[in-house]
UniProtKB/Swiss-Prot annotation:
Enzyme Commission identifier(s): 2.5.1.42
Protein name, entry field: Digeranylgeranylglyceryl phosphate synthase
Keyword S-adenosyl-L-methionine applies: no
Biological source species: Methanospirillum hungatei JF-1 (strain ATCC 27890 / DSM 864 / NBRC 100397 / JF-1)
Compartments it resides in: Cell membrane
UniProt similarity note: Belongs to the UbiA prenyltransferase family. DGGGP synthase subfamily.
Catalytic activity field: sn-3-O-(geranylgeranyl)glycerol 1-phosphate + (2E,6E,10E)-geranylgeranyl diphosphate = 2,3-bis-O-(geranylgeranyl)-sn-glycerol 1-phosphate + diphosphate
Any single GO BP term: glycerophospholipid biosynthetic process
Membrane topology of this protein: Multi-pass membrane protein
Membrane-spanning segments: 4-24, 27-47, 83-103, 104-124, 128-148, 150-170, 199-219, 222-242, 260-280
Taxonomic lineage of the native organism: Archaea, Methanobacteriati, Methanobacteriota, Stenosarchaea group, Methanomicrobia
Length: 280
């Protein structure tokens, strides 16, 4: 058994960062470091790792061409063993959630596990639904944080999750618009390839606007300081979404740097959420 291969296939850096993001989300949701922070880290890390493994399992034919050095196509891990490894990691992550955290958090963990499996197996190839799935998984990290306080906690962080989902979906769509030539060459069925770059940009703007509106709902929770800070961040996000409006092809979309601006806006909003949760 190649231990290094089994470690690398979970994308350890990616999984650890996701686990730390889970702790950060719980701080934003509760205003302090919860007693269950270690379990949150373990749950997010193992389920993220499982998602990475199952993704490699279903992508093994593509990776044999594009990423032949990865553990499965290189022969370091047998596909069947990778499948069992993914199942084991999913069971560990969900087992920890069931045993050591509130039921709502365990429910989210199980739901996310199902979505990760469905995404790897076929949703990633489904126009828009795949984008929605990825965006939800990113936003659900805040639902994890809120779920520490039960159902009421989930409700309290819903605007944060909604704002993250909206902006993340906008960025996913814009990235697909940037990647149209490569996706077309590989036979992908992305939203921009099916419905055109203009429809994609308009949908991204609508999604980003929805995210911005959701972020404003938190004014009642954190007050005027938060509102002033988030309006500045929201302006960056809307600027990023609008900046690509004149693009007629992928090259112009890349030059507009919309996805990079949206990414900067997302990181800035995360900082505002964190400071508001801790200080206000």
């Amino acid at each position: 058994m190649n231990g290094a291969a089994y470690l690398s296939i979970i994308r350890p850096v990616n999984a650890v960062v996701a686990g730390l993001a889970g702790i950060l989300a719980s701080i934003i949701a509760t205003g302090s470091i919860p007693a269950e922070f270690f379990w949150i880290f373990c749950i997010v890390l193992t389920i993220t790792g499982a998602g990475n493994v199952i993704n490699d399992y279903y992508d093994k034919e593509i990776d044999a061409i594009n990423q032949p050095d990865r553990p499965i196509p290189s022969g370091q891990i047998i596909p069947g063993h990778a499948l069992m490894y993914a199942i084991l990691l999913f069971l560990i992550g969900n087992g920890i959630a069931i045993l050591f955290t509130p039921l709502p958090l365990a429910g989210i963990a199980m739901g996310n596990s199902v979505i990760l499996w469905l995404y790897a197996s076929f949703l990633k190839k489904t126009p828009l639904i795949g984008n929605i799935s990825v965006s939800y998984l990113a936003a659900s990290i805040f639902l994890f944080g809120g779920a520490i306080q039960g159902t009421q906690g989930i409700i309290s962080v819903f605007p944060i999750a909604g704002a993250t989902w909206g902006v993340m979906l906008a960025r996913e769509l814009i990235k697909d618009a940037e990647d149209m030539p490569g996706d077309n060459e590989h036979g992908a069925r992305t939203f921009p390839l099916l419905y055109g770059i203009r429809a994609t940009i308009y949908l991204a703007l609508i999604s980003a606007t929805a995210g911005v509106l959701m972020s404003l709902l938190l004014y009642s929770r954190w007050g005027a300081f938060y509102l002033g800070a988030i309006i500045l961040v929201d302006a960056i996000i809307l600027f990023g979404a609008i900046r690509g409006m004149k693009a007629t092809n992928s090259e112009e979309m890349i030059k507009a740097k919309s996805s990079k601006i949206l990414k900067a806006g997302m990181f800035a909003s995360l900082l505002v959420f964190l400071l508001s949760a801790v200080l206000l």
